């Protein structure tokens, strides 16, 4: 499913009306998207993946036994070990609503935060550390085999023909998915 800006507004306005007034004041699209991704996980559950993710293999054998858990991929970046570009959750997990409340509270109180600290990967890492949800962290090679800014990973990625799925699968044989890290926000 692809969510548009209009879908995001409808989600907040209709399903989470207590956040609507604050959401309308947010002036950065990436912040709105980050806020909505956590609320889509709360409302619907399932997998959230950024548009620059490529699914390489069936994830059901891994995720099915973990159905009651939030599942997060790990990344070889000590500053943000848990990115928010790929996440799995059961429907209605209260962790996401708690995280959203934290984010919206900071926005309402005009707490000075970076984009990534409002509802992005820094907020996710803080929320996991603070609220300790029932979750599983996957080895980095399963979902985030490509670490941005790591020379070895960048060299490997530069040799991949990203337009051919079989070439990408060969380049990342032990991975379920990979992101191109387009950083287009």
List the predicted regions and their residue ranges.
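Small-residue hinge/turn detector
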Residues: 34-46
């Amino acid at each position: 499913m692809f969510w548009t800006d209009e879908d995001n507004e409808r989600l907040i306005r209709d399903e989470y009306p207590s956040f609507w007034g604050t959401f309308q004041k947010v002036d950065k699209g990436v912040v709105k998207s980050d806020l909505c991704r956590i609320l889509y996980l709360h409302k619907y559950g399932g997998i959230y993946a950024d548009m620059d993710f490529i699914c390489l293999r069936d994830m059901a054998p891994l995720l099915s036994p973990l159905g009651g858990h939030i599942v997060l991929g790990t990344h070889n970046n000590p500053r943000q070990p848990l990115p928010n570009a790929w996440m799995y959750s059961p429907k209605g997990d209260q962790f996401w609503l708690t995280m959203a409340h934290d984010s919206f509270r900071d926005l309402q109180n005009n707490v000075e935060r970076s984009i990534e600290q409002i509802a992005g990967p820094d907020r996710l890492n803080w929320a996991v550390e603070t609220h300790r949800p029932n979750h599983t962290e996957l080895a980095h090679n399963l979902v985030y085999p490509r670490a941005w800014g790591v020379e070895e990973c960048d060299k490997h990625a530069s040799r991949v023909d990203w337009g051919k799925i079989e070439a990408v699968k060969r380049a990342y044989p032990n991975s379920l998915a990979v992101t191109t890290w387009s950083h287009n926000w």
